[in-house]
Amino acid sequence: MRRCSLIATIVELVTAVIEPAITAPFELVDVEYGKIGSDYVLSVFVDKPEGITVNDTADLTDIISPLLDTIKPDPFPEQYFLEVTSPGLERPLKTKEQVEAAVGQYIHVGLYKSLDKQKVFEGTLLQFKEDVLTLEYMDKTRKKEIDIPYSLVSKARLAVKF
């Protein structure tokens, strides 16, 4: 099995097993698995409206860790570290619902192919309707608006405006 295929399978399996156990007020934002330095790390990103505390991550680790042990056969090729953490200020926007919730916020969008000779945009998400993001961004010193089809978005996340 190819490495990226194995990682995708692990992420899908883990998500399917832990998602039902992460209940309100918590939200499962993302699951990532990969090598950091010489160690494999399974990162589980969670959030809640008022933000995640250290105690929240400890409690969620106690819920998630035993669930991972129930996955048979064991999908992990090596020992790994489990990291339960907040998505941070630049949280990923991986679903249409997450993009919809980000309307009015400053975001970073990467595209599969160029639009107006650009593959990356940062700006305020004005609206998300009918699978189109309307983004207001700065082009040098001028404000511009662009409509980006959701199907062109390779990656989107909240961004910090400087």
UniProtKB/Swiss-Prot annotation:
Keyword Cytoplasm: yes
Entry-linked Pfam families: DUF150_C, RimP_N
Localization: Cytoplasm
InterPro entries attached to this UniProt entry: Ribosome_maturation_RimP, RimP_C, RimP_C_sf, RimP_N, RimP_N_sf
Keywords in alphabetical order: Cytoplasm, Ribosome biogenesis
UniProt function note: Required for maturation of 30S ribosomal subunits.
Protein name as annotated: Ribosome maturation factor RimP
Phylogenetic classification of the source organism: Bacteria, Bacillati, Bacillota, Bacilli, Lactobacillales
